[in-house]
């Protein structure tokens, strides 16, 4: 119904809190009535126990890339672990409270499926079904999904792209014959994903104690909407750069005020190869004051016809554009940046291609660079073997370092 609100004074009272304590305090208003605060605090600690660093996420002040928020220290080396580990623990608690098993259903362009399966496979009261586009995700991510050996995990390859997989999932949820099945979405349709991701925007502000722009590699707009959520919960920060690869539907939206579906094109950052940003509808729901009928009318002819936002009433769309800006880059830009900076910056050896969409786009004079730019590193490069193949032709020693064991 509404976002919980935190004053600046309350937010800064969490300055010395651990990440788990911060998450507990910020997210408990969403959970209150389902769990006690003590039980929720215990659940959060257990959920993040599988991360490789005690702080869960890490801010890294780099010489050449600026301030980078490392979100890849979870069990599948992708930012989705931060939300998925918490979501799976909450689903298990729900199954326990109702004494009924839950079927988790989701579609993935790579990161989501791997993280969801890893998070859910340990819970006997959860079965998980993940649809992924055949030969359109990285080989590493496909192996992560198909080699769990868990009896409650069911990965399914689907002909087409991510949008086709997601459409199958949406149809299953709507089919009348499935109304008695306890399906739960693992995609960012699930609010837990959004609320969990909002936490590290607060974490960043509390660590640097100054205004910042969050540069977010973007496909489905979930992460960007989590930043909007943090803003509506009371966090003050300058704005968000929606950084896209050559699948630039979101960039064209903010640049030209037109939302138009295009065919997804395979890229070196496959987790971002998405042509319909589902979470953008959430933002519109807020703009239209939670009027679902208006939103349904707006999307009645989409994607057959693009949606134009020039005629939104009042300052609603302009307020959105004041907070969100965007840009895009192609595969060549990503490769050139990696090659240019590889020997200068060790962090490049452990981050995936998606970071460079954020890095490149915020360094293209879109923003006032006197502000701190917080690039978000979403995954490790082992998820993107196309990078290895391309870089191998350019800088062989780069590939040797990237794939070498620790």
Language-model region placement:
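PLP-dependent amino-acid enzyme catalytic core
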Residues: 1-406
């Amino acid at each position: 119904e509404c976002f919980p609100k935190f004053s600046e004074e309350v937010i800064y009272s969490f300055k010395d809190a651990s990440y788990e304590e911060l998450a507990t305090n910020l997210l408990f208003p969403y959970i209150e009535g389902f769990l006690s605060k003590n039980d929720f605090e215990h659940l959060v600690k257990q959920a993040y126990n599988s991360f490789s660093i005690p702080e869960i996420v890490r801010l890294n002040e780099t010489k050449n890339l600026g301030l980078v928020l490392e979100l890849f220290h979870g069990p599948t080396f992708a930012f989705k672990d931060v939300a998925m580990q918490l979501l799976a623990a909450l689903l298990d608690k729900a199954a326990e409270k109702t004494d009924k098993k839950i079927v988790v259903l989701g579609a993935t362009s790579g990161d989501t499926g791997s993280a969801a399966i890893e998070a859910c496979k340990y819970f006997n009261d959860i079965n998980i079904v993940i649809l992924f586009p055949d030969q359109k995700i990285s080989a590493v991510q496909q192996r992560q999904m198909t080699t769990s050996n868990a009896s409650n995990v069911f990965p399914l390859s689907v002909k087409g792209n991510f949008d086709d997989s997601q459409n199958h999932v949406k149809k299953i949820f709507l089919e009348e014959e499935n109304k008695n099945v306890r399906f739960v979405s693992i995609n960012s349709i699930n609010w837990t994903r959004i609320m969990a991701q909002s936490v590290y925007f607060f974490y960043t502000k509390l660590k640097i104690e100054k205004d910042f722009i969050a540069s977010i590699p973007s496909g489905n707009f979930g992460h960007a909407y989590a930043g909007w959520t943090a803003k509506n919960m009371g966090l003050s920060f300058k704005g968000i750069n929606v950084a896209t690869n050559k699948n630039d539907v979101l960039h064209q939206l903010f640049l030209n005020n037109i939302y138009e579906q295009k065919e997804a094109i395979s890229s070196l950052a496959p987790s971002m190869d998405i042509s319909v940003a589902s979470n953008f509808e959430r933002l519109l729901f807020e703009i239209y004051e939670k009027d679902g009928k208006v939103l349904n009318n707006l999307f009645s002819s989409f994607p057959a016809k693009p949606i134009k936002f020039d005629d939104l009433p009042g300052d609603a769309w302009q307020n959105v554009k004041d907070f969100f800006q965007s840009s895009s880059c192609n595969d060549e830009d990503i490769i050139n940046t990696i090659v240019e900076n590889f020997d200068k910056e060790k962090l490049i050896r452990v981050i995936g291609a998606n970071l460079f969409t954020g890095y490149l786009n915020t360094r293209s004079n879109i923003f006032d660079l006197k502000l701190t730019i917080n690039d978000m590193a979403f995954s490790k490069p082992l998820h993107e073997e196309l990078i290895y193949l391309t870089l191998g032709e350019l800088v062989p020693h780069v590939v040797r370092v990237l794939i070498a064991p620790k």
